[in-house]
Amino acid sequence: MLTSRSGLGTPCVHKPFLLMSFSLLILSMVVTGLLIGSFLTVVVDRVPQGGSVNTPPSRCGSCGLRLGPLDLVPIVSWLALRGKCRRCRASIGIAPMVIEPATAALFVLMAIRFDDTRAAIPAYCILVAVLVAQTWIDLQTQRLPREITYWGIGLGAVALAVAAIVIDEPERIWMMGLGGAIALLTMWLIYTLSRGGMGDGDVRLAPLLGMYLGWLNPGIVLPGLFFGFIAGAVVGVAMMAIDRAGRRTAVPFGPFLALGTIVAIFIGQHFVDLVLAR
């Protein structure tokens, strides 16, 4: 067995899927990320309006043209059509050109981060998909749909539990639960003390973020939230400085929580070690 270089300190259990070469792994993450990103463009368009992601088939929002396979190739179709419907030439919107490559890039980063603990890659790709969708929706509508959060918690918990069993570290299951509880309690206290200064969608999102960070180490949950608050504060101050936001202007916080979580996945343990060493 190989010793993990991912920072988890766990052995990598070899299964056929886990023996894939690194270059092939990265290629598969790019392709999978683009396909999932294409699906997420449907999610961010329909879920905020209460629609189904399954039906009806994708159509042009202007002329109703049903989109065929050639209209749905990630990135390529958008570029070939120059961001317009091939029949009525109405704008398709920029979402595909942001969401699809962003999802693919983050999938690749997760593959690199968990290269020697590959059983965790599917779980953290689920997190990426949820965070990309919620970030886009929050920026557009200042809402974090509970359906996406709950699906993320359910699927993520199962995927993380499976990963813990595959790497033969079942204790990570309770670590996951502890991380979720820490994040939920922390955000609930902030929500209560701020008297509405934070949305309840942020509170619902907290256990999802906490369980993923807790699976790595419950000690990095608070740093992850801290990174998010710092990023949010910096942007909020910058917006006020350029007169784009007043003190009571609502600033979507979900994207900053997402950013803080991603940062903590990569450097959270190093941050904790640095603080404890001082």
Predicted segments — roles?
Residues 12-26, 108-122, 161-175, 213-220, ...:
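Helix-coil boundary and interhelical linker segments in multi-pass alpha-helical membrane proteins
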Residues 133-233, 272-278:
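Functional transmembrane core segments of multi-pass inner-membrane proteins
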Residues 26-31, 97-101, 121-125, 150-151, ...:
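Hydrophobic alpha-helical transmembrane segments
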Residues 89-166:
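Intramembrane alpha-helical segments
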Residues 11-48:
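Long, highly hydrophobic alpha-helical transmembrane signal-anchor segments
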Residues 40, 44, 106, 110-114, ...:
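Alpha-helical membrane-inserting segments
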Residues 40-95:
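Membrane-proximal soluble regions of multi-pass membrane proteins
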Residues 237-263:
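Interfacial loop-to-transmembrane junctions
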